[in-house]
A protein has these predicted regions:
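C-terminal peripheral helix-coil segments that are non-catalytic and often amphipathic
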Residues: 1-21, 114-117, 121, 149, ...
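Short hydrophobic clusters on alpha-helical segments that form packing/core surfaces
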Residues: 33, 37-45, 115, 219
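Hydrophobic/aromatic residues within well-ordered alpha-helical segments
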Residues: 33, 76, 83, 87, ...
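Helix-turn-helix
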Residues: 36, 44-78, 82
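Amphipathic alpha-helical linker/stalk segments
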Residues: 81-110, 152-161
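Hydrophobic alpha-helical connector segments
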Residues: 96-125, 173-180, 209-212
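Amphipathic alpha-helical segments used for helix-helix packing
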Residues: 107, 120-142, 190-198
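A contiguous binding-surface segment within folded domains or other stable secondary-structure elements
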Residues: 130-160
Length: 228
């Protein structure tokens, strides 16, 4: 590409390109403010979804003015994008840790446990994800068809290899993964229903341990190679 020229005392000389200024590191206060906003946004988005949530609601939940919030996040989409990226990184970590070199039954048991722990510890994130799915995942479809699909394909291949080696019973690995997602995330997405039906005697924190024992029996008994 030829150099850009500017006029200077009747002569054309190459213009010097300005180098981009280095991004300034965030201060501790800026990071703390962003964390407050993201925490408030998680509450609002998990209740109302992306479309129903407003900047005003998030600012009110964060206890700050709307102009102050917009200084850190100029658009609602930026807040949502940051939340979804953090959530997906956390959400997919247990599946990433699914070890092809491990013993199949303990690996699957550990995965079920981790997913239930996440349903217990991150219910708002789970509901945020469910809301996004119900809206057709317009802001997540690239990740679902890319990073998520690649990861599930990889772990489905691990499950198929275990089946071929006779270590677990043969079944559809994709629907096995979907079923683990559905049954574990139910305890976050439908938490109110679960507690209402179980009642005060069984609807406390112990419900997650009860669920873990049930789901382990449901999945692992069916996957043991001599179970069919």
């Amino acid at each position: 590409m030829p150099p850009i020229k500017v006029k200077n005392a009747g002569k054309s000389v190459p213009a010097r390109r300005k180098s981009a200024a280095p991004a300034k590191a965030q201060t501790r206060i800026q990071r703390e403010k962003q964390d407050v906003i993201l925490e408030a946004a998680l509450d609002v988005f998990s209740l109302h979804g992306f479309r129903g949530a407003t900047i005003d609601q998030i600012a009110e939940q964060a206890g700050m003015s709307k102009p102050n919030l917009l200084y850190y996040f100029p658009r609602k989409e930026e807040i949502h994008k940051r939340l979804m990226k953090t959530m997906l990184d956390t959400w997919l970590q247990p599946l990433r840790e699914f070890d092809a070199e491990g013993d199949p039954i303990p690996e699957i048991r550990s995965y079920i446990r981790r997913k239930l722990e996440m349903a217990r510890d991150f219910p708002r994130e789970s509901r945020l994800f469910a809301n996004e799915m119900l809206q057709g995942a317009p802001r997540l479809i690239d990740i679902l068809e890319g990073e998520l699909k690649d990861l599930v394909d990889e772990k489905a291949a691990v499950l198929l290899a275990w089946m071929d080696e006779g270590k677990i019973a043969r079944t559809d690995p994709y629907h096995l993964i979907f079923s683990i997602w559905a049954t574990t995330q139910h305890y976050a997405d439908f938490d109110v229903q679960v507690r209402a039906v179980l009642g005060p005697d069984r609807g406390g924190e112990g419900r997650f341990e009860d669920a873990a024992r049930f789901l382990e029996a449901l999945f692992l008994n069916g996957l043991r190679p001599n179970s069919r």
